[in-house]
Amino acid sequence: MRVEICIAKEKITKMPNGAVDALKEELTRRISKRYDDVEVIVKATSNDGLSVTRTADKDSAKTFVQETLKDTWESADEWFVR
């Protein structure tokens, strides 16, 4: 499965150093518990977005990734060490 998370450039510039890499690592760890062969890409773009590809169950996978992203973002104080 390939997960591509697009974060608006103006938001990325406000994130602490290392936050993008830490987010990628944490999402990979969490999503890998349910799906094998996960590739997570976090990149700066003009708009926020999420795409999930290379999986047979796209709808349920995207729902799972959206929930996981939300939980991960909301619990950043627990896993992100500056």
From Swiss-Prot:
InterPro entries xrefs: DinI-like_sf, DNA_damage-inducible_DinI-like
Keywords: DNA damage, DNA repair
Span of the signal peptide: none
SUPFAM superfamilies per UniProt: DNA damage-inducible protein DinI
Statement: the UniProt record of this protein carries the keyword RNA-binding: no
Domain of life: Bacteria
GO biological process: DNA repair; SOS response
Family under the similarity heading: Belongs to the DinI family.
Name under which the protein is recorded: DinI-like protein Z3305/ECs2939 in prophage CP-933V
Native source species: Escherichia coli O157:H7
